[in-house]
Amino acid sequence: HLMSGSLIELAARPADRERLYDQPDAIPGAVEELLRWVTPIQQFARTVTADTEVGAVPVAEGDYLVMLYASGNRDEAAFGPTAGELDLTRAPTTPNLAFGFGEHFCLGAALARMEARILFEELARRRMTFTQAGAATYLPSSLVRGPHEVPFTFS
């Protein structure tokens, strides 16, 4: 869903896409920004294993907590005053939450980053232009946000 979501964003921003093509060294940073922005895994729930507090709110053992990764990836305290905007030149100073964190960090993170990087490097090498050729349909899920189908026209 990272790649299809990223293609949707780049199709809507042809000037950003061209800048990326002109500066292929910026692709790894752009992948991080697109991960932050697209956030395919929107949230995850956990069961609290011991009484604790989260942000001064008491949480009891056995309670469920839902971590909203997409919301965390828009946090102005972490990503600055423009956290609500896609900026392919944003310096990745704060790790995004697209792959989770801690012991539950996604084992496929390096592979997904590599796949996206190679996709954008190849698009840049070939100077591929593309447009979205119709509306995307999305998976009916609160956990995963990703297109089920999205038509593109490449040239």
Model-predicted regions and their roles:
Residues 1-155:
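Cytochrome P450
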